[in-house]
């Protein structure tokens, strides 16, 4: 049986990975206690749909509930620490990688 190559597999939200640089990911993490749609788009790309942003926030809200974290500023935002945990963004790993890049003199000044 031949598969139709024109049919695209619907991507799961768990397949989505951040496209932002290490510096951008760390800057967002340390600058914002809660993040909204703008920051989510900075992390995952400006072209992601509103429904994808909503699904990412839903994952983060579930993690907030697990971690028993309350909203600080707005119910339209999600806690940054919980969001990064829900999305599989490891801040310690990012910092380690940034130090390695600096040691190899591969970081832009």
Predicted regions located by residue number:
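Coiled-coil-like amphipathic alpha-helices with heptad-repeat character
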Residues: 4-6, 12, 50-52
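A detector for short, charged/polar N-terminal pre-domain segments
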Residues: 7-33
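Positively charged, low-complexity intrinsically disordered regions
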Residues: 9-12, 42, 97
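Generic signal for short, ordered secondary-structure residues
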Residues: 18-20, 39, 62-63
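Polyanion-binding surface elements
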Residues: 26-52
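Major-groove DNA-recognition helix of helix-turn-helix-type DNA-binding domains
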Residues: 44-85, 89-95, 101-106
């Amino acid at each position: 049986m031949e598969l139709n190559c024109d049919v695209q597999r619907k991507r799961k939200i768990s397949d989505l990975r951040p496209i932002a640089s290490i510096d951008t990911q760390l800057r967002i993490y340390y600058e914002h206690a809660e993040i909204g749609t703008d920051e989510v788009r900075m992390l995952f790309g400006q072209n992601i749909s509103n429904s994808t942003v909503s699904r990412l926030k839903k994952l983060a809200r579930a993690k907030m509930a697990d971690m028993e974290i309350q909203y600080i500023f707005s119910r339209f935002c999600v806690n940054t620490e919980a969001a990064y945990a829900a999305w599989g963004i490891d801040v310690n790993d990012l910092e380690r990688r940034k130090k390695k890049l600096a040691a190899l003199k591969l970081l832009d000044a």
